Amino acid sequence: MTAALAALPAAYAIWHNEYCHVAGRPAVSGIADLVRTLGGPRLVPARTVEELRDLVRAGLPYASLSAVASGFSLDGAEVVSILRIPARTLARRKRERRLSPEESDRLFRLGRIGALAEDVLGSREKANRWLHAANRGLGGAAPLSQLDTDLGAERVEEVLLRLAHGVVG
């Protein structure tokens, strides 16, 4: 483990070890996929985990939320539920054009799982269907319905990583 990786919070280290090396990909490819999911390098100019962490801490642009929501066919109610942002606060964030660090962290979690699903399943369309459909590995719940908490996101990630490694069920 590199010194830079060791200095990161545990969740980022786990994400780096598991997600960035799915199918043998180097870390920079995983970051590029996640940046694309969050709206692209113009919105999220990060090339490293550290840069991405700093952007999340500063608050991601509201346009990143729009990119994730449209990219994964999320309606307003799903965004409010998954990100735990009241509708009035969401409207204020849209006017301010920036999310809080806490909201950004939840959006990062959603984007990370979405990017992982796209990577594992091979396309955004397949990831979209999978995220919205009931899943036996999640007790019949749709993966998106689990992403409002870290524990739920970890369960969804475990299911995706099992799929990536050919373990079904």
Map each language-model feature to its residues.
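Non-transmembrane "mature" sequence context
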Residues: 2-169
